[in-house]
Amino acid sequence: MGTDAWDGKQAAPPRRARRWLRWLMAAPLLFAAASVLQVLILRVVDPPISSMMAGRYLEAWGEGDWSFSLHRQWRDYDKIAASLPISVVAAEDQQFPMHHGFDLQAIEKARDHNARGGRVRGASTISQQVAKNVFLWQGRSWVRKGLEAWYTVLIELFWPKQRILEMYLNVAEFGDGVYGAQAAAQQFWSKDAAGLSPSESARLAAVLPSPRRYDARRPGAFVQRRAGWIQRQARQLGGPAYLQAP
């Protein structure tokens, strides 16, 4: 009897180990299923807040600013001036209509540029930025980069290009705490996003790399130069019709 009791005690740890092993094996599958469901839902449902917006709240509260609030208001793609999407694409990701989430040529150029030293250049596509802004957190860890790649693949697989761009135009930060085209148009020019001029659209696109540093409403020399370049690039691409290309 003593031997049987001892055998039972010895058998318990292996059973627990197998149970934990099963959970560890199931966890990636559960995450994959949950993330696919997330992406499918957001194909048709407009998110009330993105992970980056939530991060701004946490950042402000961590600094003791409990009165902090964001400016945001969703606008459907067809309710945004046609000059803004093409300005953003001209500024951020000119291969957007053609690539499947990753611009390998831009990545190679950025790597070569960064290897030579100087100012670090990124190569994130609009799809990658949507994956980061909607689903993930700030940071440069390999885990976050891996998740960004995973979500990029999913949104390219399950969302049409127009939905990806619509999401970007509604969650991108265009000023300190100002998220989305509608909030930017109202805060900066007291108008609706549908009424943005090509010049205003180019200025909004120009501040995207550092929206808390640059001001689209009162642009400095850098933003003015970049906005002019963006307008020229948008014209060379063919204007808004470029985004209708198959």
Swiss-Prot record:
Q: Which reaction does it catalyse?
A: [GlcNAc-(1->4)-Mur2Ac(oyl-L-Ala-gamma-D-Glu-L-Lys-D-Ala-D-Ala)](n)-di-trans,octa-cis-undecaprenyl diphosphate + beta-D-GlcNAc-(1->4)-Mur2Ac(oyl-L-Ala-gamma-D-Glu-L-Lys-D-Ala-D-Ala)-di-trans,octa-cis-undecaprenyl diphosphate = [GlcNAc-(1->4)-Mur2Ac(oyl-L-Ala-gamma-D-Glu-L-Lys-D-Ala-D-Ala)](n+1)-di-trans,octa-cis-undecaprenyl diphosphate + di-trans,octa-cis-undecaprenyl diphosphate + H(+)
> Primary place of residence?
membrane
A GO-annotated cellular component:
peptidoglycan-based cell wall
Give its E.C. classification number: 2.4.99.28
Q: Where in the cell is it found?
A: Cell inner membrane
Q: Does the keyword Nucleotidyltransferase apply?
A: no
List cystine links.
Answer: none
Q: Which UniProt keywords apply?
A: Cell inner membrane, Cell membrane, Cell shape, Cell wall biogenesis/degradation, Glycosyltransferase, Membrane, Peptidoglycan synthesis, Transferase, Transmembrane, Transmembrane helix
Q: How does it sit in the membrane?
A: Single-pass membrane protein
Mark the transmembrane ranges. 20-42
Drop me one GO molecular function for this one: peptidoglycan glycosyltransferase activity
Task: Report the pathway entry.
Answer: Cell wall biogenesis; peptidoglycan biosynthesis
Top-level enzyme category? transferase
Q: Which domain of life is it from?
A: Bacteria
Q: Name one GO biological process term.
A: cell wall organization
Q: Which InterPro entries match?
A: Glyco_trans_51, Lysozyme-like_dom_sf, PBP_transglycosylase, Pep_trsgly
One of its Pfam families is: Transgly
Q: Which family does it belong to?
A: Belongs to the glycosyltransferase 51 family.
- NCBIfam families under this entry? mono_pep_trsgly
Role played: Peptidoglycan polymerase that catalyzes glycan chain elongation from lipid-linked precursors.
Please give the name of this protein: Biosynthetic peptidoglycan transglycosylase
